[in-house]
Amino acid sequence: MKAKSAIESQKELLKKVIEVINNIKKEINIIDVYVVGSRARGDYLDTSDLDLVIISDDFKNLRYIERLEKLYKYSKGDIEFFAFTKEEWDNPKSLFIINMKREAKRLEDLAKSYDINF
């Protein structure tokens, strides 16, 4: 069982991420959002950052660095972004994305599991 401080850090970080996503939605048409890494697997510490996959077709024709530039201006420091189009996410051509998808949890589902509205 997770320590209370780790669970509280997960809830607080999820609330912060939802606020960040709502701000990003003002500029980018987001199709879906996934949490990956330790926060998705459940092996996080209370100091762990949150790895977030943003799916948007607004990323088409943008170099990867340009995608991240669009996202990082919204970052609160403890969020790591990954940015893919729907096609890249649905039909991955790299092991990196394939492995990411194995552990991915939809942000909306993860938030609900902590009784957080999204």
Segment roles from a protein language model:
Residues 51-54:
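Short beta-strand->loop micro-motif that forms the acidic, two-metal-ion catalytic signature
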Residues 33-37:
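Short gly/ser/thr-rich secondary-structure transition/capping motifs
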Residues 1-31, 41-46, 56-118:
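Catalytic core of pol beta-like nucleotidyltransferases
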